[in-house]
Amino acid sequence: MSNLKHCSNCKHNGLITESNHEFCIFCQSIFQLSNKVSKKSNFHVSNKLIHLRNVLRRLLSNQCSSDVIVELKSVMTKNNISSTDIDANFVSSFLKANEKINKKDYKLVFEIINHIKEEKLNLDTSKINEVIEIFKHLVFFCQENTPSKTINYSFFLDKIFSLTSVTNNLKPQTVKNYTKNNSNQLVWENFLDYMKKKKINTSVYDYGHEYVFVDYGFTTCSLEV
């Protein structure tokens, strides 16, 4: 991401050029290249990058109540369930059955799995930069090559985490629609083929922990998967 430019609104080097406009991944401003008039927008690419930051922040912090972890471990002990058998489907079912959540929250599920498996995520500064870089390319790829602009975060982040050796344990929750599961897998395989042919920048922008934890006044995003 060596082509990031200076944003006149938030004063960060966060402008990405796309077709006839530029958008800032930090403050969400969009600049028309013709007249440079900025405006606030829910531009889906920048929104997805903001949401990714929220996910990384969640995984690097402890927001889940310890009581939930203790209760889940008690259920595992009672039913002789190993931590290696714990996946997103199991955790999600536990949360819903015990009325811990009233909507799907894969970030919470990810965090709980991380606690149960007692795994320290390999998310140092270089890994954060790598994950964000791949995710950015994935967003643009989906925008240009898929009919829907929505992204199954739990599915694709699991793939990216595995690819970058962050973790192999955060398995996504499968959905009942097998066609959708197969579609996500096909998108991922096509994306990998696309990236193999694409000339990648040798210079990766340094996001790091400061980017993940800085507060720009955005509200926490919780999307249903």
Swiss-Prot record:
One Pfam assignment: Pox_VLTF3
Origin superkingdom: Viruses
unnamed zinc finger span: 7-27
Molecular-function GO terms, alphabetical: zinc ion binding
GO biological process annotation, one example: regulation of viral transcription
Keyword terms of this UniProt record: Activator, Late protein, Metal-binding, Transcription, Transcription regulation, Zinc, Zinc-finger
Keyword field contains Disulfide bond: no
Coiled coil segments of this chain: none
InterPro entries: Poxvirus_VLTF3, VLTF-3_Zn_ribbon
Keyword Ubl conjugation: no
Family designation: Belongs to the nucleo-cytoplasmic large DNA viruses (NCLDVs) VLTF-3 family.
Function: Acts with RNA polymerase to initiate transcription from late gene promoters.
Quaternary structure (record): Interacts with the late transcription elongation factor H5/VLTF-4. Interacts with the late transcription factors VLTF-1.
Name used for this protein in its record: Viral late gene transcription factor 3
Gene: VLTF3
